[in-house]
Structures are given as structure tokens and as C-alpha cells.
Amino acid sequence: MFEMFPNFWTPVLPIAEIGTDPVAVELAGESLVLFCNSAGQFAALLDRCPHRGAPLSRGQVTEDGCLECPYHGWQFATDGACTRVPFNSLNPTQLSKFSVVSFPTRVIAGMLWIFTGTENVSELQLPSSLLEADDRYVIHHEIWNAHWTRAIDISLDYLHIPVVHRNSFGAELNDIAHKDAICASQQRFAIAQISITATADGMTVTNRLNTLPSGIEIDWHQPNNVVLNLDGMPLLPHFFAIPINAQQMRFMQVILPNPGVDRNSFNFDDFFAASLDDRTMIESQIGEVPNTTEGCHVPTDEPSLRFRRWYYRTVKKQSIETIQGTSVN
């Protein structure tokens, strides 16, 4: 289960989009159903009734907070336990054999988080910027036709900004790049200064050009979160690349405005629109990021290369072990 993204915590959807009507989502190749009962408890279940395999997302949430299958009316609690089978007299022991698979959930930063596994649930490590009240965050998400690793790869790449974002916030860096082309013969051109500090759950990458007074700090938190610290920006953006399947991902932007920012007057849409440049680029690439032994690399690629090494040593390794374990059993 979750072979392409096993045993990780990840946000799935904003809680504002999950109510008492069941919501069908795909996460890392698995079909899930999300819902919230009248007591405010969120749940994530496998979207398949154990009786006849009907999608539970086509059912309804009952008054007592259970999810009812649309086929025969079987009911399931938020923990997946079967609570009712109509027209049958079953004792608790019999009902316990009819549970649907459920997954651990948390509500953090206005999002529903799911652990992509059912055993050995790890602690959820988060940057302090994601521990504010739920209503502090502005959330936007889109489905992109790309592997999730491509979004992390480009988010860690400082030097894509002057080219991919030349018509938006990368214009200044693009001007510098063009001046470099003119001055290259005189050996007077900007040099990227990139330093990497390993952290408990990823890395911090400090980026700047030697001709500019300021730069960008990028924090990567395993597995799929990148936080950008831009000098002078009145907000803190968190990017999540959430795998849907091998061909699609949900790109979620979670914005924490600085105290004092007027949320009604700040143009968040313009900020979100800048990611469309990234979307166009990574949707033109095929599959997951290649291993570090493939392709050509230069010193400024090191942040992306570190992510790729981690991905192949950790996520891909788990994926292979999960597949092998399934085939053996």
C-alpha cells in the first residue's frame, strides 16, 4: 500500500474542503475517502467497502457520524470499525471482522494530514511556522501532471529563477544573467554562492549572487515540503508536492502572512500565479527525477542532487521493499 510514498506524513487537502459529505481523493496511488463527522472528527479510510468493493465516497455520513456504504448500507466509524450491517443480526465479534482500513490523521495549519501506512506511525516533525492557528494560513492547491519529485527539485533550484521566472519575480536575476553574457569575455560576471546546512529533517540552502546584497533561503523538510524565506517578502510560503500517482501531484501552497499584513488587500492570486511558470516546466519533464548518476551536473546543482540521493536511498528503497514484501506474501 502507498508503494510510491510509504510511511510518511503528508497534507492532503485543506480542512475547509472536507465536511460531512465524503470526499474522494487519490494519494500515492491509493483511493481514499475523507470525511468529518458532526463531532468535528476527521477520518481517512480506504475508499472500498470490504463487502462488495463499492466506493465509500459515494455514500453518506449518518447522524451518528458513521460513513454509510452506498451499496448495502454498511456503516463504518472514523476508525474504520464496522458498526452496522442492515438486515443481519451480528455480534461485536462478527462486526470486528468487517472493518475498513483506516489511516492516522492530524489537523495542522488548516490541512488534514495523513500517514501513508498503518503500522509504526512516526512522529510528525514540522517547522515552527506550521504551528500557528489554522485560520492564519492562506491555502491554494492545483493538480499538476508531473511526478511529485519534480516539484521539490525545481523548488530547491535557485538558478532556475532568472530563466523560468524571467517575466515575474526573476526579472532582476535575468537582467544580471544577460549582462554576464556581455561581460563574460572580460571575466566580470556574477557567481552564485550556495551553502547547504544539513538539518534534522532535511537541509537549509542559502542562495545569493555575489553581485547582490540579498538572496533566498530555502528550507527542505522531508519528504515533500519546501519553505522559502525571501528578503523583504511580507509572508512565508510553504510548498507541498503531494503525490497523487506516478503521473500527477497536488501542488499545495500554504502561505503564512506576516503579522500586520492586510489579507483583504494583499494580492495572493498574483503570488500563486508565479508557480504556473514552474508548472509549465515540470509538466514538460518525464517521470520522476533521475538518479545522480544520470545527466550532467555542475556545483550549483548540489541542493537538487542531495534531494535525489535521499529520494533514491529512502523513498525508492522503501517502495522496492514494499513491492517485494507484497509479492512474497
Language-model features: locations:
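C-terminal catalytic domain of Rieske-type non-heme iron oxygenases
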Residues: 122-329
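A boundary/linker detector
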Residues: 1-6
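Rieske [2Fe-2S] iron-sulfur-binding domain
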Residues: 11-136, 329
